[in-house]
């Protein structure tokens, strides 16, 4: 860059130039002197009415400095100094004019002395007084005007950045397009930098500056002062574009009011002023080892020193430069007072009877004022702090402009690192920490400050509010209080710059903590690029389960703060999963991506995220921030739970065991458990009430003692395996604190040397060695080294006693274990007796090491990273870089006590213990590398091979080819480019393809379109404009006739008929007729017709008429269209009491009914027929009734002739009471003459069958007795037959019946069989040949071994019956049958393959069953080498499959089925099927209902069932004399002994249900036994829960009752030991169930506890439901007059008949007269939707809720809540 040249011009030219510039200069001075600066770099007048004069170029911080590169002019503003002809002069563009103006500019030094912005003037003058020279200085401003876009000449501009038909200032069109998307940078970017936005250059690595004109020198990190130092260039020459003259001008710029000073030496300047490596938007990222311990990837350009000031050590060091605030800080330091408007919510916990509940109450809106950074309201207990500055690196705001910094940072914003050790001293920060401790709870909010000047990025203030722990706070507004701004001295003014935030920043992101103001002579650094979530705060979720976000944080955060730390999902209105993050910092497309645990500080820095600032991260524990993560630590006596985020007491995992007592009364423990358990298992469950040998009472829930042993609440306990126990060593902060205190009081070496490595607890073994060959008695101490990286530990003496700690160390002694100490030589010194060199006044005589006293001197034990000086008297730094630890992959930088590797690009730093090395980075593993191609990793780099559809660009990346740029790609459609390809899409309706684009189609050219209207073409469509009488169709593409009849306005009193374009009226209503033109119905005058209203006056009305002034005896009708007679018999004034009033014209008469007589002409009195006459004698009593009488007949008589006399009831003719006998009617009764085999019943007198088979001796031992009506029969066994009398079984003599059955052998009859005997003992009988043959000589014949095929047939397999239309092998007869047993009996198929049995006439059947059907071989029985066969007992082979509902009886061959009563045998199914008695038995006057094995007759009132049970007859008395419950009542027996009933219930009879469910054990004259009280039948009969059955079956939604009275009970398993319900198992009734009745427990034995109804919260009590059928007694199924006996309900008899009282969950279907299930999931009439956050499943009589992922079931009303 050449030096500026001063050009002399003539006075005319200068006057002309100043004449053109004078208005602009005056406007500049007048406008900016009172201008307010906003956050986008614009100067605006203080008055709102003043016009905006000008604005600097761009919206970056370059506009804030005094150096102005160019100005944009407004579209209609003239350019000063140039005429319109010169402005538009062809052939000479704006760059040429600028070059000419540049040539006429004065020198840079002159310009800087003449042009000063108000901001720099205030910064440069400490007192804020502007000298007259500065006020009257003239401004020389260089102008630049954007070129007119070339696209304006090609056609209309579209898209963004278009202003008034041309590109907006700062933008131009890209090549071959009409879009203003190309930014303009003037002057252009240098050194191959790219123009990202107007006047914003993105620099390549190694360059910086507003135009990338400077080269960044390489810098090293100096740990002494924690700031980077530029490396000296070769020969000390300055970088490009930087000369000594230029440096001199820099100093002149900073100090404009001082005389010019000579330029300082370049070497001194480079050493004392740190350069900005990350100036501009350079992509250079250099990571240096952070001096802090949190692992922050800090910038190497951080300002050093404790405060925000930076002093220059050059010749101008006497002048102080005040640093401006970091980027993004608005002008809020002048605010003295703010107000905070918030609403507190007070929550309190109330406990009653062992249960605690939280009650919250919202308070009033409260306003607190913060004066001087903090405010306090002593009445409400609230305290607030606010900060106008962001506290970085985990710092906390504790007052106005005051940050409390953690141990690893310092400075005003906590933006500076501090040297090691990493933990802060105990005394540091105690002054401010005391403000944050105490009983109050603290909440932190980062909010924008309202009531301030308009700005793009409003000021963010951090408000910390201390409030009572039971309160929560919601802040509504943080506002600045006007009129409370104090004047600020000029030296403390802030240079306001354009504020931008990096990617992902929000109100919580302190991204600008490490920024440095621009150096003198440089353009200020541009701000970071705004992110896509600029200024956006959302909800952070800690867990994501199956796509559902859960566990949200209690405060709003930005996406980067959330996803970079502990969050898994983030969003504002809907959550989205966090994107993946790289393993190390990566810059792609100008954006910096930070690894997990870090966030962007600016475009080139990643800063560690302090997760400990997140509320509620470590519950009840202390959060410690670490590098890229965090840890939760606990106090002594506490430990982390399995979640590693909460501290629990050691008592929660105690393994001490003792007895657990289930009851504790008056300090006495009873009911101990058998097994010893821990206290937390005993007390955390609901079982134990006390524990231990001392009977320690379990703490109540909700108390602190309960939370100590049960931190997870009721039902949960920790085990020692869940929590990893660890010994707690002394913290580094505790070990290092005495060292810091020692050094604070001494003046020893600088603190950076000895504090490089933290002290760790270690042990050592000291061995006394032999005497050294030195003078005196000095002894040497040999140190055994095994771990050289641990610091020294002061040993104990030879006897094992601990040696006192050395000063400056303060390390407590540990156990006597092996000590690990690095060895060194021994330095022996002499001194007077008692002289201790280690305590001779020096704080640390050895420096970074440990001084060890020897008998005659001392020695130094150096710390790791240090070595003994050659003089052997102190420790010095060890230069590890001489050993090349970085192995050529990076540059080694030695530091005091350590070293670091600065890895080259393509390598990453790996730390292994205390060593560092550079490893190759596999760039191909990073997402997005080589997108559209294949990545190949190389040593230190990588390269891409592009796929088809991609092309390699300049930087080695693959870029998609946009095929749609070619017009011929999609000639007939629309081209859509995609990564690596493209797609041709058909044009939408209304468009046609033309050269790759879709153009509009003119549908109006189509003939016949828009009939009855006019066609109007539109973009992509068309519409019709209709003629009068027509309207548009819904799609607006046609015209249709308007139906005038659709509106009631046409023919409202008639029938409207629509026509094309018109309508007509017809069929007018009564009282109207059609007018002449037929378009309306007019009123008809009915009074004009004769005969209307003959007894009154006719009055015409619209559409009708009325009759008025009726004659006497008449009145107007209700319709008013006639006069009607007055009926005197109506109304309450009826004169005929007890009789019928008959109306006449003008009068009436009384007619009395039969049995009444008229008295006084108006009253009908009853005639008493029973007086003086005996109408019902002699078998009845006369009872008078109103208007009649009836006879009350004696038993055995019935009323006749309408109840006027009594006649005998012929029971023999009506009911047939004598079944099996002859009925003889008597006067008022009857007698039964029973036939043989019947006897009269003692209770009813009817003839009942005598069961002869009750005597076991009947039929003898060889038969089975089968009882029949009036007799019996004997069914004899095989070989026996019935005797002639039929009452016994006698043996059959086969030898007599079967002639020659034994052939030539002798036949001998035996009991039930016979034998064939040969005459000679040398012969034996052959059953197959039927004669005797000689015996085999020597021995009996050996049976033949069956073949393999025969053996397979002897294997037991499945036997199948005939399928009868179903699948062939679906009916199994037996599981283990041989083929002969199956196929010779009832089987049809056999075996694993279900092979069919052979037919009876086949050879296979003859071989399988030689003896025929029904005979099987005897296993193991052989005679003369042949198998013996016997009859197959089908009842044994196929017992379960035969004769179901009956008894199987074997015969020879075959079997018979003896079916139970009510069943008949079905030969097809081989079972006893139910016999439908209703088909052949007439249920007279009633309804017959068939049941399984029986039937029932049901009668309708007033009929009742007679004693035969098959006929419905009239009751012998009136219905009033027989209540509903008197049907089928009998004696109830209280005791049954040996099947004999005794102790009948005296006083009244009961029903079967009432007897068995109360105290009875049997019922009726037949002594019918009641079911056992522990059986399921009893539970169903008496409507009680069966405890044992419920425990076996688990939890049921409904009890198993069916009929009978009783409340709606729930099984006992729904209740705990104390009677309290388990809310986790509540069904869908939405109410807490009541426990079973206490009186039912008396039937369960003495050991069953009686359950008491628990205390229920009022909000859970169900409302009282009044059941109108609750007072009726439930009937048994056989007693019910409804089909199926009211399943899912109870049958009750009411006066109208029978009905069903349905159980809960069912409703009565009156059409089916049955209880059907209620689908609760479709019932939308409830108070709240069922199963919120889940889906509802309907079940029989109930429903279930299935919660969605991330939700769990909640007690109370059925809904699902988010999982915590």
Swiss-Prot record:
Main location: secreted
Region (C-terminal domain): 1585-1764
InterPro entries: ECM_structural_protein (IPR050751), EGF-like_Ca-bd_dom (IPR001881), EGF-like_CS (IPR013032), EGF-like_dom (IPR000742), EGF-type_Asp/Asn_hydroxyl_site (IPR000152), EGF_Ca-bd_CS (IPR018097), Growth_fac_rcpt_cys_sf (IPR009030), NOTCH1_EGF-like (IPR049883)
Domain of life: Eukaryota
Cystines in this chain: 185-195, 189-201, 203-212, 387-397, 391-403, 405-414, 540-562, 549-575, 563-578, 612-623, 618-632, 634-647, 660-682, 669-695, 683-698, 684-710, 838-851, 846-860, 862-875, 881-892, 886-901, 903-918, 924-935, 930-944, 946-958, 964-975, 970-984, 987-998, 1004-1015, 1010-1024, 1026-1039, 1045-1056, 1051-1065, 1068-1081, 1087-1098, 1093-1107, 1110-1123, 1129-1141, 1136-1150, 1152-1164, 1170-1182, 1176-1191, 1193-1206, 1212-1223, 1218-1232, 1234-1247, 1253-1265, 1259-1274, 1276-1289, 1295-1307, 1302-1316, 1318-1332, 1359-1382, 1369-1394, 1383-1397, 1435-1448, 1443-1457, 1459-1472, 1478-1488, 1483-1497, 1499-1512, 1532-1555, 1541-1567, 1556-1570, 1557-1582, 1680-1691, 1686-1700, 1702-1715, 1721-1736, 1731-1745, 1747-1760
Domain EGF-like: 181-213, 383-415, 608-648, 834-876, 877-919, 920-959, 960-999, 1000-1040, 1041-1082, 1083-1124, 1125-1165, 1166-1207, 1208-1248, 1249-1290, 1291-1333, 1431-1473, 1474-1513, 1676-1716, 1717-1761
Residue ranges with Polar residues bias: 108-128
Domain TB: from-to ranges: 538-590, 658-710, 1357-1409, 1530-1582
Keywords: Disulfide bond, EGF-like domain, Extracellular matrix, Glycoprotein, Growth factor binding, Heparin-binding, Hydroxylation, Phosphoprotein, Repeat, Secreted, Signal
Residues annotated for heparin binding in this entry: 331-341
BP GO annotations: response to alkaloid; supramolecular fiber organization; transforming growth factor beta receptor signaling pathway
Entry keyword Glycoprotein: yes
Glycosylated position list: 175, 330, 408, 602, 1160, 1255, 1376, 1514
GO CC annotations, alphabetized: extracellular region
Stretch list, region Heparin-binding: 94-115, 226-243
Quaternary structure and partners: Forms part of the large latent transforming growth factor beta precursor complex; removal is essential for activation of complex. Interacts with SDC4. Interacts (via C-terminal domain) with FBN1 (via N-terminal domain) in a Ca(+2)-dependent manner.
Family, similarity comment: Belongs to the LTBP family.
Name of this chain's protein: Latent-transforming growth factor beta-binding protein 2
Organism expressing this protein natively: Rattus norvegicus (Rat)
Taxonomic lineage from the root: Eukaryota, Metazoa, Chordata, Craniata, Vertebrata
């Amino acid at each position: 860059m050449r030096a500026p040249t001063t050009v002399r011009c003539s006075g005319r030219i200068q006057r002309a130039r100043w004449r053109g510039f004078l208005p602009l200069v005056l406007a500049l001075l007048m406008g900016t002197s009172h201008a307010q600066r906003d956050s986008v770099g614009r100067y605006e007048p203080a008055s709102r009415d003043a016009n905006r004069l000008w604005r600097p170029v761009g919206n970056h911080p370059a506009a804030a400095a005094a150096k102005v590169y160019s100005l944009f002019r407004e579209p209609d503003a003239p350019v000063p100094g140039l005429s319109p002809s010169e402005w538009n002069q062809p052939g000479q563009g704006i760059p040429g004019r600028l070059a000419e103006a540049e040539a006429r500019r004065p020198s840079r030094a002159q310009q800087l002395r003449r042009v000063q912005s108000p901001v720099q003037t205030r910064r440069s003058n400490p007192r804020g007084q502007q000298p007259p020279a500065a006020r009257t200085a003239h401004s020389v401003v260089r102008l630049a005007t954007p070129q007119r876009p070339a696209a304006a000449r090609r056609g209309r501009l579209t898209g963004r950045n278009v202003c008034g038909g041309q590109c907006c200032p700062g933008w131009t069109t890209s090549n071959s397009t009409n879009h203003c998307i190309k930014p303009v940078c003037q002057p252009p970017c240098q050194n191959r930098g790219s123009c990202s936005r107007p006047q914003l250059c993105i620099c390549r690595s190694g360059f910086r500056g507003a135009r990338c004109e400077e080269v960044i020198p390489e810098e090293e990190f100096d740990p002494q002062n924690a700031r980077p130092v530029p490396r000296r260039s070769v020969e000390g020459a300055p970088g490009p574009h930087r000369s000594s003259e230029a440096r001199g001008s820099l100093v002149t710029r900073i100090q404009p009011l001082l005389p010019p000073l000579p330029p300082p030496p370049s070497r001194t300047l480079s050493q004392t002023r740190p350069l900005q490596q990350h100036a501009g938007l350079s992509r250079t990222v250099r990571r240096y080892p952070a001096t802090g311990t949190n692992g922050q990837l800090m910038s190497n350009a951080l300002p050093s020193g404790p405060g925000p000031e930076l002093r220059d050590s050059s010749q101008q060091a006497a002048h102080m430069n005040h640093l401006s605030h970091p980027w993004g800080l608005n002008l809020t330091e002048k605010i003295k007072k703010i107000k905070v408007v918030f609403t507190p919510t007070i929550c309190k916990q109330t406990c009653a009877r062992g249960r605690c509940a939280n009650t919250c109450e919202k308070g009033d809106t409260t306003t607190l004022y913060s004066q001087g950074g903090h405010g306090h309201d002593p009445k409400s207990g609230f305290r607030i702090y606010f900060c106008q500055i962001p506290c970085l690196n985990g710092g906390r705001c504790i007052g106005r402009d005051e940050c409390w910094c953690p141990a690893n940072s310092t400075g005003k914003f906590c933006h500076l690192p501090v040297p090691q050790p990493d933990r802060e001293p105990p005394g540091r920060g105690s002054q401010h920490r005391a403000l944050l401790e105490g009983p109050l709870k603290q909440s932190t909010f980062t909010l924008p400050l309202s009531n301030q000047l308009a700005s793009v990025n409003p000021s963010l203030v951090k408000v910390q509010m201390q409030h009572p722990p039971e309160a929560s706070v919601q802040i509504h507004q943080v506002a600045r209080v006007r009129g409370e701004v104090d004047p600020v001295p000029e030296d403390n003014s802030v240079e306001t710059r354009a504020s931008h935030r990096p990617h992902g920043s929000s109100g919580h992101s302190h991204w600008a903590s490490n920024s440095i103001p621009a150096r003198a002579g440089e353009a200020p650094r541009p701000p970071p690029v705004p992110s896509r979530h600029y200024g956006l705060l959302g909800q952070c979720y800690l867990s994501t389960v199956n796509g559902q976000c859960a566990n949200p944080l209690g405060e709003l955060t930005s996406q980067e703060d959330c996803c970079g730390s502990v969050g898994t999902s983030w969003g504002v209105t809907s959550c989205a999963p966090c994107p993946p993050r790289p393993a190390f910092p990566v810059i792609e497309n100008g954006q910096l991506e930070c690894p997990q645990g870090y966030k962007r500080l600016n475009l080139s820095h990643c800063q560690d995220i302090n997760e400990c600032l997140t509320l509620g991260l470590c519950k009840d524990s202390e959060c410690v921030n670490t590098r890229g993560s965090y840890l939760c630590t606990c106090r002594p006596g506490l430990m982390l739970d399995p979640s590693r985020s909460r501290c629990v007491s050691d008592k929660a995992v105690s393994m001490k065991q003792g007895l657990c007592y289930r009851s504790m009364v008056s300090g006495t423990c009873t009911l101990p458990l058998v097994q010893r358990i821990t206290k937390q298992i005993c007390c955390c469950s609901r079982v134990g009430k006390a524990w231990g040998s001392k009977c320690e009472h379990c703490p109540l829930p909700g108390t602190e003692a309960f939370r100590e042993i049960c931190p997870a609440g009721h039902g949960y306990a920790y085990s020692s395996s869940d929590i990893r126990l660890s010994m707690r060593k002394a913290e580094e902060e505790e070990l290092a604190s005495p060292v810091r205190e020692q050094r604070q009081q001494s003046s020893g070496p600088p603190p950076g040397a000895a504090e490089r490595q933290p002290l760790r607890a270690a042990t050592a073994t000291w061995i006394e060695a032999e005497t050294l060959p030195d003078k005196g008695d000095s002894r040497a101490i040999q140190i055994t080294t095994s771990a050289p990286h641990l610091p020294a530990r002061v040993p104990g003496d030879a006897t094992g006693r601990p040696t006192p700690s050395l000063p400056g160390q303060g390390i407590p002694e540990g156990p006597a274990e092996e000590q690990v100490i690095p060895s060194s030589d021994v330095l022996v010194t002499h001194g007077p007796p008692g002289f201790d060199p280690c305590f001779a006044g020096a704080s640390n005589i050895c420096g970074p090491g440990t001084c060890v006293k020897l008998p005659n001197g001392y020695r130094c034990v150096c710390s790791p990273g240090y070595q003994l000086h050659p003089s052997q008297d102190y420790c010095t730094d060890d230069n590890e870089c001489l050993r090349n630890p970085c192995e050529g992959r990076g540059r080694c930088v030695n530091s005091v006590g350590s070293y670091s590797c600065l890895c080259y690009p393509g390598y990453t730093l790996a730390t292994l213990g205390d060593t560092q090395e550079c490893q190759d980075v596999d760039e191909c593993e990073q997402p997005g590398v080589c997108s559209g191609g294949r990545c190949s990793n190389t040593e230190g780099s990588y390269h891409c091979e592009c796929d088809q559809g991609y092309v390699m660009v300049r930087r080695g990346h693959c870029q998609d080819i946009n095929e749609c740029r070619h017009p011929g790609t999609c000639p007939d459609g629309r081209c859509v480019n995609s990564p690596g390809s493209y797609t041709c899409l058909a044009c939408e309706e209304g468009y046609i393809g033309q050269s790759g684009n879709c153009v509009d189609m003119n549908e109006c050219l189509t003939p016949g379109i828009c009939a009855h209207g006019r066609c109007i073409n539109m973009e992509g469509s068309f519409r019709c404009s209709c003629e009068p009488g027509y309207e548009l169709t819904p799609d607006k593409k046609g015209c249709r006739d308007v139906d005038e009849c659709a509106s009631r306005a046409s023919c409202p009193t008639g029938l409207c008929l629509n026509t094309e374009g018109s309508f007509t009226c017809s069929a007018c209503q009564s009282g109207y007729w059609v007018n002449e033109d037929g378009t309306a119905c007019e009123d008809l005058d009915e009074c004009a017709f004769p005969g209307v209203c003959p007894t009154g006056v006719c009055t015409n009305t619209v559409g009708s008429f009325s009759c008025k002034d009726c004659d006497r005896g008449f009145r107007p009708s209700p319709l008013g269209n006639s006069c009607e007679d007055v009926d005197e018999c109506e109304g309450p004034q009826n004169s005929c009491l007890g009789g019928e009033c008959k109306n006449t014209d003008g009068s009436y008469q009384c007619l009395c009914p039969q049995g009444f007589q008229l008295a006084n002409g108006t009253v009908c009195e009853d005639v008493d027929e029973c007086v003086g006459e005996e109408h019902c004698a002699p078998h009845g009593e006369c009872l008078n009734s109103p208007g009649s009488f009836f006879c009350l007949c004696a038993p055995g008589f019935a009323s006749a002739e309408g109840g006027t006399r009594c006649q005998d009831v012929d029971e023999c003719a009506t009911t047939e009471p004598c079944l099996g006998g002859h009925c003889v009617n008597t006067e008022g009764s009857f007698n039964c003459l029973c036939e043989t085999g019947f006897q009269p019943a003692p209770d009813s007198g009817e003839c009942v069958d005598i069961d002869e088979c009750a005597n076991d001796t009947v039929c003898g031992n060889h038969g089975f007795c089968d009882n029949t009506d009036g007799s019996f029969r004997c069914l004899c066994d095989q070989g026996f037959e019935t005797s002639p009398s039929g009452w016994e079984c006698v043996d059959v003599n086969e030898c007599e019946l079967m002639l020659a059955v034994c052939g030539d052998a002798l036949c001998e009859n035996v009991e039930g069989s016979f034998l064939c005997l040969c005459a000679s003992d040398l012969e034996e009988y052959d059953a197959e040949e039927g004669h005797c043959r000689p015996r085999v000589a020597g021995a009996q014949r050996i049976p033949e071994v069956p073949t393999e095929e025969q053996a397979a047939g002897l294997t037991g397999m499945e036997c199948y019956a005939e399928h009868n239309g179903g699948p062939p092998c679906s009916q199994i007869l037996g599981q283990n049958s041989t083929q002969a047993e199956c196929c010779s009996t009832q089987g049809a198929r056999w075996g694993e393959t279900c092979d069919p049995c052979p037919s009876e006439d086949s050879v296979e059947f003859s071989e399988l069953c030689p003896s025929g059907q029904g005979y099987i071989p005897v296993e193991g029985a052989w005679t003369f080498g042949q198998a013996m066969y016997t009859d197959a007992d089908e009842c044994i082979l196929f017992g379960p499959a035969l004769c179901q509902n009956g008894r199987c009886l074997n015969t020879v061959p075959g079997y018979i089925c003896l079916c139970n009563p009510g069943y008949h045998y079905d030969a097809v199914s081989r079972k006893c099927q139910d016999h439908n008695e209703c088909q052949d038995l007439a249920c007279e006057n009633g309804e017959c209902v068939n049941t399984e094995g029986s039937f029932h007759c049901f009668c309708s009132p007033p009929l009742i069932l007679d004693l035969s049970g098959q006929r419905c007859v009239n009751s012998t008395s009136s219905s009033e004399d027989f209540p509903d419950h008197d049907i089928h009542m009998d004696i109830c027996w209280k005791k049954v002994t040996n099947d004999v009933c005794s102790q009948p219930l005296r006083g009244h009879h009961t029903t079967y249900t009432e007897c068995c469910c109360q105290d009875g054990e049997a019922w009726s004259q037949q002594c019918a036994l009641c079911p056992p009280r522990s059986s399921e039948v009893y539970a169903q009969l008496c409507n009680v829960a069966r405890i044992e059955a419920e425990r076996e079956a688990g939890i049921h939604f409904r009890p198993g009752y069916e009929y009978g009275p009783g409340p709606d009970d729930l099984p006992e398993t729904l209740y705990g030991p104390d009677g309290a319900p388990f809310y986790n198992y509540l069904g869908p009734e939405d109410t807490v169930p009541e426990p079973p009745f206490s009186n039912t427990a008396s039937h369960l034995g003495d050991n069953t506890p009686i359950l008491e109804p628990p205390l229920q919260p009022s909000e859970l009590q169900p409302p009282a439901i009044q059941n109108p059928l609750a007072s009726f007694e439930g009937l048994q199924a056989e007693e019910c007059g409804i089909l199926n006996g009211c399943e899912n309900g109870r049958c009750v008899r009411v006066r109208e008949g029978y009905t069903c009282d349905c159980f809960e969950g069912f409703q009565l279907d009156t059409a089916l007269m049955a209880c059907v299930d209620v689908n609760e999931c479709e019932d939308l009439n409830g108070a709240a939707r069922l199963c919120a956050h889940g889906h509802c499943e309907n079940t029989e009589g109930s429903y279930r809720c299935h919660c969605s992922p991330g939700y769990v079931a909640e007690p109370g009303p059925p809904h699902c809540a988010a999982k915590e």
